[in-house]
Amino acid sequence: MIVDAHAHVFRPAGVSPRGVDALAPAQRDAPVEDLLSVMAEHGVGAAVLVPLDHHDDYVRDVLRSHPRRFAAVAVADPAVQGRGHGDPVDRLKQRRDAFGFQALRTQWLGIPGRPIRESPFFPVLRVLADEGLCLWTYLVPDQLPLADELARELPSLTMVLNHLGFCPHDMRVDSHGRPAFDDPFPASTRAQLQRLSRRPNVYVMFSGQYALSRREPPYTDLDEVVHEIAGAFGASRMLWASDYPWTREVPGYRSLLDLPRATFPQASPAELADIQGGTALRLFPHLRPAEDR
């Protein structure tokens, strides 16, 4: 079964609360019904839904309506990261009681240069490890060094590096209404990814090429770094994702579905099956078809 391991669904801000910015202005709409239609058209059986921010309402409601079709990721707010008022573990539990998410996304782990165990976020990260929840990371550059320390301190924590593990910085919105970045893989990031690949519970998402490349699919200007990442992590720790809705029109869902085979023409059917769904199903086994559970 093909699984889209990272897709965003949301409604206009006046319909369901969410943040507003240049990428997702107030009237932009990405309802789950459209995603389901796109998935059906392309033979995709399940997806992992990621809200735009800490507003859980819409994805929570979608998950309640489609509990076997979707897994869900919550986005950590300052209170969950221990940078607000109150106990961050209590805040995590309050949100999870209302919204049964299976992973938590963050751009922040702790104070650069300080031990990860001293981070106010560490108690929450330990709860994730203890409860078998994934950490969905989209770390800014000064946070990536903390990820390896975290993987060492909490070896049972499953960490999924979003969008090939690159560190977002200086985002702009392109003419197609998509995020875009320059210089996504400096030598320091590539070295950190190699170190992280040695941690068996660290995974990487095969996605985001559209925002990182200066070419059209199959984004051959990224071949060197993508093959380097794939060689380090292996297909069994890679997850294909569309990053819907930013990619819905350009390059289009089909182009992204074809990308693993185009990028790895020597990959075996089993390796391609892992990238396009097998890995995600191991992380989110409730998405497996009933006959395979």
Locate each region found by the language model.
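Catalytic pocket-lining loop regions of alpha/beta-barrel enzymes
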Residues: 115-239, 291-292
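Divalent metal-dependent hydrolysis catalytic cores, especially in the metallo-beta-lactamase
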Residues: 22-54, 69-77, 102-109, 135, ...
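Conserved, mostly hydrophobic/aromatic
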Residues: 6, 39, 59, 104, ...
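Mid-to-C-terminal alpha-helical segments outside catalytic/metal-binding sites
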Residues: 1-5, 23-46, 227-228, 232-239, ...
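Active-site neighborhood of phospho(di)ester-bond hydrolases with catalytic His/Asp-centered motifs
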Residues: 2-5, 49-50, 73-74, 105, ...
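Active-site gating/metal-coordination segments in enzymes
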Residues: 56-143, 149, 183-184, 209
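Active-site environment of divalent metal-dependent phosphoester hydrolases
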Residues: 10-13, 54-57, 79-81, 111-112, ...
